[in-house]
Amino acid sequence: MFEESAFIAFTTADLPKAKRFWVTLLGFPIVREDENYLMVDACGVRLCFDLPDGDDHRIPGSDGVVGLKVKDLDAALADLASRGVEAVAGPFDDDHGKWAKLVDPDGRSVILTER
């Protein structure tokens, strides 16, 4: 029935800040963009960020969590820190495995987990 995930959409309050975080700092390539919209390829999953319009009652940053797997969490955190992205929590090593939490410019959680 379903073949694959097409995209996941989020609301952002500021497209340039979203682009800087997801493209410049995290390194995801742009699939499509215009003045009100940004789509990036996050390891095969397309993440879409758009500005809320007058009829859109979604609050930027309140609509989800992005989880990303990394081979080496400590190395990933060090690399991200060198680019100005700091973990706001962790790293932790618990029943869920080894993980840390980042936040994007809208306050959305980005969880990094070690494989």
Question: How should these model regions be labeled?
Answer:
Residues 18-23, 80, 107:
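Conserved active-site tyrosine of GNAT-family acetyltransferases
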Residues 1-17, 46, 64-66:
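N-terminal beta-strand motif that seeds the catalytic metal site of vicinal oxygen chelate
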Residues 29-63, 109-114:
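Conserved short beta-strand elements that form part of the metal-binding/catalytic scaffold
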Residues 27-32, 87-91:
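Short secondary-structure junctions
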Residues 12, 42, 70:
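Aromatic-flanked redox-active Cys/Sec active sites in thiol-based oxidoreductases
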Residues 66-77, 85:
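Mid-chain, well-packed structural core segment of small domains
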Residues 82-115:
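Vicinal oxygen chelate
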